[in-house]
């Protein structure tokens, strides 16, 4: 989540940044869904539920992006979701994007979109069809001081039957909350513009997934050649090799 930022540089910062804030467990009452996507509240720890609650209770923006389609079959699709550092390496190898992911621990990654936003992405919960993320990062603009916001992303995905073209469809619910009072006031005034910027930035990430899936389907040999550089263990590298080999004609 450019030229469009020059008109409203303040609003661009809304999309990615995040920092945790304290929240009492007693106040964490989560809704059953976000933008129509079921929220896996019961699978969250008390502290993670507080993080989600403090964003979605009174967000600066709330938007839905998608559905976006990728031609990948489910096993490879889920592998790349579980190992975004491998997906980022493949995106660079296939000249799709230069985004960076670095694993910091279980379900925790350092992410840098190379567009002013960098920070920690956490996977809070996952099921067969939903994944809940919390993004904590810092965004820098040449026209404005660094800004922090807190972002909750809830993704829903489904496999399409061969009769519908196969592959996966994904929909993303994005909630942001700004901690800077000046920015928060401006967002309240320019809410429609802010929602449009957030949607555009989130759509960029969804399009990256679609473009990477298309590139892998077209160029599996080039993807296999990139395997030695993958920041993966031997077992994960072998698993990815198996998935990519299945893409060969």
Model-predicted regions and their roles:
Residues 23-105:
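Hydrophobic ligand-binding cavity/cleft-lining segments
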Residues 26-44, 154-249:
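Terminal "cap-and-tail" regions of soluble proteins that handle hydrophobic small molecules
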Residues 1-5:
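N-terminal secretory signal peptides that target proteins for export/translocation
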Residues 8-19:
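Bacterial N-terminal signal peptides
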Residues 86-87, 138-142, 177-181:
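Solvent-exposed loop/turn segments at secondary-structure junctions
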Residues 100-152:
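Glycine-rich portal/gate segments that line the openings of hydrophobic small-molecule binding cavities
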Residues 87-110, 229-244:
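Short solvent-exposed beta->alpha transition segments
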Residues 61-66, 73-76, 129-131, 151, ...:
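Envelope-exposed proteins and targeting segments
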């Amino acid at each position: 989540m450019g030229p469009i930022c020059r008109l409203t540089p303040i609003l661009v910062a809304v999309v990615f940044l995040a920092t945790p804030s304290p929240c009492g467990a007693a106040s964490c009452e989560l809704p059953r869904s976000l933008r129509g996507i079921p929220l896996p509240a019961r699978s969250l720890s008390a502290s993670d539920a507080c993080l989600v609650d403090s964003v979605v209770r009174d967000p600066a923006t709330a938007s839905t992006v998608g559905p976006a389609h990728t031609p990948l079959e489910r096993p490879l699709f889920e592998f790349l979701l579980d190992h975004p550092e491998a997906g980022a390496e493949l995106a660079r190898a296939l000249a799709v994007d230069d985004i960076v992911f670095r694993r910091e621990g279980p379900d925790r990654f350092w992410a840098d979109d190379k567009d002013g936003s960098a920070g920690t992405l956490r996977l809070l919960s996952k099921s067969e069809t939903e994944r809940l993320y919390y993004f904590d990062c810092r965004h820098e603009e040449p026209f404005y001081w660094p800004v922090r916001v807190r972002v909750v992303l809830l993704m829903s995905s489904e496999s399409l039957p061969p009769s519908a073209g196969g592959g996966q469809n994904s929909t993303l619910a994005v909630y942001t909350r700004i901690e800077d009072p000046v920015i928060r006031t401006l967002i309240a005034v320019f809410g429609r513009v802010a929602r449009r910027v957030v949607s555009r930035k989130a759509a960029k990430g969804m399009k990256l997934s679609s473009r990477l899936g298309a590139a892998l389907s077209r160029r599996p040999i080039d993807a296999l050649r990139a395997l030695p550089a993958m920041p993966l263990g031997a077992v994960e590298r072998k698993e990815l090799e198996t998935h990519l080999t299945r893409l060969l004609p």
